Amino acid sequence: MQPQLPIEVDAQTGVWTTDGLPMIYVPRHFFVNNHVETEAAVGREVYAPALYKAGHRSAYFWCQQEAATHGLAGMAVYEHYLKRLSQRGWGLFSFVAADPVTGHAQVQVDHSVFVLAQGIAGVPVDRSKVCCLFAGWFSGAMDWVLETAGSALRTTSAESQCAAEDGAHHHTHCVFTVSPL
């Protein structure tokens, strides 16, 4: 299978774009090793909230741009977001459930980059919830949907299960739960 994303490369600058947004193409182990070492240096209690805020802001911006680029609205933008994340190698993202009126959603992530990279190229094995980078993405997208529908409701998102977790019940995928603040 070939990539499903349109990729343009500027001949003058070498900048890659998809749907008009600049992209960076890096090996998975490079990104995950940088992520893991940053978390180790500053601690998850500091790093996770910073990732959440940045991810929320980026997802909101992405939804705004993609809605304009493709003429999409509402949950179609959020669905397109999950499709594009899946096409970019982060994992396979799908809704278990979603309600744009109440701000509730559950997003399933199969084959998360953070789970698959463990034990490869120096990435340590961690049997906890390791996919926290995604959390802000899902509330950012839902908040965009809510705001553009005229709702004042805002959401939060958290990883409720991770395929990396070790314990009585091994999970084959990760789940993120989006709920109103």
Task: Label each residue range with its predicted role.
Residues 138-141:
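Mixed-charge, glycine-accented linear interaction segment located at domain edges/termini
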Residues 145:
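Active-site or metal-binding loop neighborhoods of secreted/extracellular toxin and effector enzymes
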Residues 1-132, 150-157, 162-175, 180-181:
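N-terminal accessory segment detector
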